Amino acid sequence: MTEYLLLLIGTVLVNNFVLVKFLGLCPFMGVSKKLESAIGMGLATTFVLTLASVCSYLVETYILSPLGIEYLRTMSFILVIAVVVQFTEMVVHKTSPTLYRVLGIFLPLITTNCAVLGVALLNVTENHNFVESIIYGFGAAVGFSLVLILFSAMRERIAAADVPLPFKGASIAMITAGLMSLAFMGFTGLVKL
């Protein structure tokens, strides 16, 4: 039980996919201008990452490995992720049309979010079992959502601040992301995996 908790904390804080592994930077920079859209994207990504992590584990364990076709791993994981994203898009469209409009193009772009594929591939390379795959996928999603929401809140405050003209826009956003990354480095000694 302790190793599962350490895996979760390690994935959320110590080995954060955005700030440490640099995966998922496109939605991190693209959706983080408004807090509302960042929360929606975080929830959608949490659902997709967790479900895709489970599905990719099942595909790897029960289809690819027994048939000896591990060389199709990346292509099959992309297919699994695309199916999960389409399912998520249908659910969001039916349950919250306003969130569906706010997320716009970024919801289908979860398919190409490298963090989702990265979690699926890292689950296989790190030999996680079924429960560890769920925890790893959920932890990566929570870490992504946490960083996205924090960054979005900071960007809203920075937008209202008096920022020098050369630093407005992407420049100050990159500086802020770098400072967040430094802050998350403080968690480095927290969990040894």
Curated annotation (Swiss-Prot):
Chief site of localization: membrane
Keyword Cell inner membrane: yes
UniProt keyword annotations, A-Z: Cell inner membrane, Cell membrane, Electron transport, Membrane, Translocase, Transmembrane, Transmembrane helix, Transport
Pfam families named in the record: Rnf-Nqr
One of the GO BP terms on file: electron transport chain
Annotated transmembrane regions: 5-25, 39-59, 67-87, 102-122, 134-154, 171-191
Gene Ontology CC terms, in alphabetical order: plasma membrane
Subcellular localization: Cell inner membrane
InterPro entries assigned: Ion_transpt_RnfA/RsxA, NqrDE/RnfAE, NqrDE/RnfAE_oxidrdctase
Membrane topology: Multi-pass membrane protein
EC number of the protein: 7.-.-.-
Keyword Ion transport recorded: no
Protein family according to the UniProt entry: Belongs to the NqrDE/RnfAE family.
Database matches in HAMAP family: RsxA_RnfA (MF_00459)
Physiological role: Part of a membrane-bound complex that couples electron transfer with translocation of ions across the membrane.
Subunit structure: The complex is composed of six subunits: RnfA, RnfB, RnfC, RnfD, RnfE and RnfG.
Identification of the protein by name: Ion-translocating oxidoreductase complex subunit A
Gene name for this UniProt entry: rnfA
